[in-house]
Amino acid sequence: MAKIITNLIRTAAIGLALAATSSHAQAQGYPERPIALLIPYTAGGPTDISSRVAADVASRVLGKRLVVENRPGAGGALAASNMAQNARPDGYTLAVTPITVLRLPHISTVAFNPITDLTWIINLAGYQFGVVVRADSPWKTWQEFTAYAKANPGKVTYASPGYGTTLHITMERIGERDGIKWTQVPFKGTADSVVALRGGHVMALTGSVPSEQIEAGIFRTLVTWGERRPVRHANAPTLKELGYGIVTNSPYGVTGPKGMDPAIVKILHDAFKGALDDPAFLKTLDRLGHDPFYMSGDDYFRWARENYEIERRTVERMGLKQ
């Protein structure tokens, strides 16, 4: 009997050793071909632009090209959802992942769980959100804008990435506080929202404050949503300054399918982390109105797990479940 147990232990040990050797060999040869990076918004938007620059940096480190594929939809959750359901955990399909993936399962029925079905690799940046209008609009301040909206229920239209996104929820929170009813007009990304605002199809835009349009005198920033005023928009107050008690920070990073080899995860983490030291990437973030926001894979996963519950409570409190 003792001999049988000894043999079983030996066999198990050999199996573990072979598995470790196979994993090591796989990681040593990785990557052997181009890697697909799914972007959750339309081409030409802020997340698309910053992600492409990060992908270029990672490509140089890895020695293989990251091929960007735009998968807009579901308020930014479609890319990660498609990856989680269809991709093999071999490191050749990744997704840029916004906070929407943590909220969507609480709003509607989805076919994946972002906590158990994703590998959280690295967080890279966070959005500087705010509300902007055209420079020729009649509203010079946030107070003027909200006064008009309150006096004209449902008349003010604003562009957002869709129902249940951080932008939609924050505008609803503001509306609850101020007794305002406004009309959300959903688009697949900021690029489309910018076009709509420039064309006069909506009255305001919520999202990453487009610095270039502000500096060119095309748009005017009425309010920002961060902890402090962005350097490029120092003339616009924050919601916090105005007494709302609302601070919105929405990180985004890179995830993969569940079950990825930890050695490959580290290779990818280190490749993308190089972007946070790259002048071109940092300059791009500044131009787009984003902040560098690093979280390691472990920290990113812990953050996701905590915020998954926070989002559940928010959806329940605001009655957003469909």
Language-model features and meaning:
Residues 9-21:
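Bacterial N-terminal signal peptides
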Residues 26-117, 155, 163, 178-208, ...:
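N-terminal (or domain-start) structured segment
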Residues 46, 50, 54, 58, ...:
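Stable alpha-helical elements in mature extracytoplasmic
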Residues 85-92, 105-192, 239-244, 249-284:
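Hinge/capping helix and adjacent helix->loop/strand transition within the periplasmic-binding protein
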Residues 98-99, 135, 208-210, 226, ...:
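Short secondary-structure boundary segments
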Residues 1-7:
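N-terminal secretory signal peptides that target proteins for export/translocation
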Residues 192-247:
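Anionic-ligand binding region
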Residues 32-34, 176-180, 262-322:
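An extracytoplasmic/periplasmic, membrane-proximal ligand-sensing/linker region
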